Amino acid sequence: MKLNEIKQIDVGGDLLANYWPEDEYCFSEWVTLSIGVKGEEGSTYFNLLVCTPEWISRKLDSAQSVWGRHMLIIRKYDTELIESEVNKKLQELLEIFTGDDDLKFSEKIARYAHWEYEDYVSKSL
């Protein structure tokens, strides 16, 4: 099996399509990506900070720096663009990943979106 389908993108438990920021040119919002196997139940969850350059600029007005891991930076809020970019990245990863191991594939996705098991180390007794 390989995670190969975006099942849902949501913001705070609500569908991305139902969310709209106060300022579409200056916002940041964590979205949850539910990624699973097409035609099967279940998903693995990843989090991604979607933000604009203007939001980053305003953060820099009050801070010396802004860290940038697990971010998708877009010019203005656009649900279709967000969905398209997330799907495009998943397809790019599917094309270069030849294995069939969901754990290893999740580690690849985690380079772009935070995965709850990222850096998890199993402790044997």
Protein language model features and the residues they cover:
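Short helix/strand-capping turn motifs
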Residues: 1-102
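C-terminal charged interaction modules
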Residues: 92-125
